[in-house]
Amino acid sequence: MKDTIIQWHPGFVAAMHLELAENLEELIFEKEYNLNTKPLLVDLLVIKKESSVPIKNEIGAIFREYNIMEYKSPKDKLDIDVIYKTIAYACLYKSYGEAVNKREAKEITLSLVREGKPEGLFRYCKQEGILVEKKYNGIYYIFNHWLFPVQIIVTKELEEENHIWLKALTEKIKEQEMQRLLKQIQ
């Protein structure tokens, strides 16, 4: 009897049906609801080996110990739901540490990268009183609103000499820009 594993979730689901019995007609119950059809993957996780070492590239100025980066292709949207999805990834990453609070929330940042400026997202932030601060050309910070510091990187606005590689992630690359990239490789 000691090795018996109690399945609590079916009992919980049944109990919630009974608790909310007066409104069963108005409710939908989805037990063990799949949040996603594919495995949840972070586009890029950048871990600072030594937290006191400053990152020279301005994209890394916001970095703490754990830095989650989400890339959106030129055709992908970057809206408020993408922000919340990325926050959810960060929350899961934080909670899956090897021990309780092994990954402290204060040591996590989020970076969302896209070619075009997410005008709709910035409008939403303004309407909701969320401060978006332009920190550098093409780099916008959002502090003190969500659980983690967020930066939005607009690759089209970045200075080419410092960010040639990110700026190359476009469908509109020009021949002279391609030649500059090839020279950088050689």
Predicted segments with their positions:
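Elongated, amphipathic alpha-helical interaction scaffolds
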Residues: 1-186
